[in-house]
Amino acid sequence: MLDRMPDAVAVHRLSRRIAAPCILASVLALLVFAGAAAGSPARSDATRAVPTIAGMDDAARWTAAYWIGRAPEADRPLATPDAIARQNARLLREDPSMHALAALGPELQGAQVRGWIEAVSRRPAAARFDASGRRLAPRSLDRLIDALALDTIPARQTTRYGLVVRRAALRTFPTDQRVFSTPGDTDIDRFQESALFPGTPVVIAHASRDGRWLFVVSQRYAAWIDTRDVAEGDAGTVLAYGARAPYRLVTGAAVHTAFTPEAPAVSAVQLDMGTRVPLAVAPAQGPLNGQHPASGHAVELPVRDGAGRLVLHPALLPRSADTADGPLPLTRRHLIGQAFKFLGERYGWGHDYNARDCSGFVSEVYASMGLVLPRNTGDQAGSPVLAVDRLGDAVRRDVAMGALEVGDLVYVPGHVMMVIGHADGEPFVIHDIHGGGQRGTGGDVVRLGLNGVVVTSLRGLVFDDGTPYVDRATAIVRPADVR
């Protein structure tokens, strides 16, 4: 997920996972002229001039074509599909942040389930505030802990499986209440962990005391999900769904199934980049959900029946939607092109705001080429499987920065950026960030408030205290260097 940042720019560690969302994004200023009763009108934050992003005056640099044109051997595959598949399999076996659902067996042990929950659902040590700015009282936190129903976890239980039926939030606690670190600053919900997309297989490990929430384990994350967002099915059907062929892979930022009043459960369903959906077993010979099927791909989507059980229902995915019949080749052209499909999207901590954060952004870009990454920045940068260059002193960092290639992932505390090339002798990156700053003409720190997917110079970025991002770089991951 994100990657949990503490209340400012620091990194908060949760058991095996380092959460630390990203820190940047695009803010287009709204000019609002306030009427004045007497004298000059006061200028609010919304009416102040937006700083120019250093190195981005040339409009061409905001296009994928510019960077693709500068990329060496833009169409040369950087890894074969077989090599990528082998690395994905290794990641599932050897990376402790990943969960091999098929290997969990027919029974779950109570200690294992309790460990999963307690790794995520920890009582906050710092103050938390609700949307109105009121501090959460101890009794409110007590209720959240009680809702976990840890006392009801059996010593052993039959392993249950399900498929996610719609884009769904993963939560720290079984609640949809939004909580924040600072009164009035409601952009980052500290109870938001991540999100799962339709068709994601999960193991259903536990239920909240009121039954409205399920604790689920997916391949890349474990947390609480609304019960209504999961359809329970048998292990064979659930685990086979994502491996079925032929299929369509979403290669756009997001696509939607065709609107259909005849089948509301599969109408206008959002499918984000990297989502894989199998084609319908028996393509429709007549109308499909009230529409001729020739103009779309007939796919099968998971839905819940009245009892919450899994049913696979046909849906139409328009041929105009940005999808493919398999992963795109892992090339510099596609790395840049796929990343730019998110340009300008608002930053969303833990996939909030129907968007994504820094680690989610790079994960979805690589997923469109068939390559799996761990969910959080800490797990990505610390993976025992990926090609990771852990940076040390300044000399080593400078050497590494000079050797950056398209697709490399650069990590600083709480954030990850993807290299898209060089200009003016400097590396440039595309990233999904919440804040971000740079030096002004007088040497002072200028806060950019990027708050979305943007392109910036790597060396030009500074933290609030003026320290350059590159001086705090901790690791470089080259996902295309498959092992």
Task: Indicate where each model-derived feature is located.
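Bacterial N-terminal signal peptides
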Residues: 22-32
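Boundary regions of SH3-family modules and the immediately adjacent low-complexity/disordered segments
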Residues: 41-168, 217-249, 285-287, 291-336
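Aromatic- and glycine-rich peptidoglycan recognition patches
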Residues: 42-61, 220, 228-249, 254-258, ...
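Short, structured beta-strand/loop micro-motifs enriched in basic residues and often containing a Trp
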Residues: 166-170, 174-187, 248-262, 387-395
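Conserved beta-strand/loop element in small beta-rich adapter and peptidoglycan-binding domains
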Residues: 185-208, 265-289
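Second-shell loop/turn segments in exported
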Residues: 186-189, 264, 321-326, 344-353
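...with weaker cross-activation on analogous glycine-rich loops/strands in unrelated enzymes
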Residues: 195, 373-440
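Active-site nucleophilic cysteine motif
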Residues: 335, 339, 349-369, 373-377
